[in-house]
Amino acid sequence: MTSRNLRAFSQWSLAAAVLLFNALAASAQDLSNQSIASTTAPVMFQFVVTPDIGSIGSLSADSENNIWATALTNSVALHFNGSTWTKSAMAKASRVNKVAVISPTNVWAVGQGTNDKFSQIQRFNGSAWRVVPSPHFTNGESLNSLKAVAPNNIFAVGVSLDGLKNRLPLVEHFDGSKWNVVVVPNITGGELTDIAAISPSDIWAVGATGGATPAALTLHFNGQQWSRVSAPSASLLAVTALATNNVWAAGVQLGRGPVIEHWNGTAWKVVTSPTIDASAVLNSIRAISPNDIWAAGCNACGDVGGSNPALIEHWDGTAWSINPSPVQLGGLAANALLTFPLTKRIYVGGFAFSSFGASSFLMEGVE
């Protein structure tokens, strides 16, 4: 099972469909993206001992002493208080896709409710996780990610189904009192998988449109309305934003493997990155600075018989290169990244998969 399949193995997973087609596609084509040597020393990641929660699908923090990691399934999370990782029971859910930490008493998570047809939003108030009322569509919807611009300005993105069961991009907004559906371009087959913000009037959401050849879906919010911006063909699974003219997205191209795209303030363009197996995927991307950006995913996604390390790539301001990853029995799929610019500490979370099942893993490295 691939990392995104485990994240969203239900009817909602556009990304899972992409990976299925990808795994069946021909071997990787020559993209003229040969492996690139890094000009900086690699970060030596080490496994962090934590309770096993089956998988880590998301990481977020407001400081290095208040870190949350949520499981994709099992309705459980991990919390780090600066010295110890402990389990935290969440509200019952079929899936939790993303977590966002605002403060020790204000943490949000989005995913799917217990019946998997409808999305679920829950909040941690410092003592317990509780479900928060949110909009629902007759035919259902899914929320894949969220971004807290401020406590009273939170966006969640995903996909809904219309009366004809067509997939449509979905954005919801929390104004400090309640969640509401936001008007976005009506793009049939569209799904949003991640969101990043530079300011309240400069926000990006990325994803893909369905079909035999998925196309990139990038939406921009200027503080007033959402509009579609064209981007090279790909299924974009993650986005990180540094400045108005410096936004990065990562994902997968059908039959070709991982893709990284960059917004320079004018246009989205594919940036050369190392050649990987066609079944490899980048699930997460996070920036420390313009010359220090990290992306993570899986190498031979779904190969439960191998011992493939997690896929970790680094941008040093000039080129993308592969950073070594620890190896353990079974394959490793990274779903989540967390970076701390001041200390240059990086966390990578995901799951180890083998014929015996899946277990969560967390790695830590310091530049």
Predicted regions and their residues:
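Residue-level hotspots at or immediately adjacent to binding/recognition sites across diverse folds
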Residues: 29-367
